[in-house]
Amino acid sequence: EQVWPGGLVVEVKCPFRGGQPAPHVKVLPRMMPQLQGQLLATGAATLHLVSWSPYGSTVFRVTADLDYQREMGEALALVARQATGDGEELGRLSRAVRERSVVLAKRSERVALIPPSECVSVYDGPCAVG
């Protein structure tokens, strides 16, 4: 709370796509359930997603969306009750969560682009990145 009003969560991803490490250029909708779940679990209002690579990094701001978190909770509750056979309602909620994930991913804001730099290690010996 003293560092960031409303609390702050930091999630770090190290993407390795196509055999090459490269930072994300945007927040992907498929990340949204995890990111919003972290915000819900911690009660924080903001999450900074750091996408790191040895060639540079990006930082994105993701804000909590209580409606989305509620829909996720409803979908999870339906999965838990799946034996009751309410697949139609689960399908509706699943589609709603996927659609909202796209909206929230687009709303996420890139707050920093960090250029590559020399590897700095607090450990003795060579740097692990090379």
Please report, for each region that a protein language model flagged, where it lies by residue:
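Accessory terminal regions of nucleic-acid processing enzymes
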Residues: 1-130
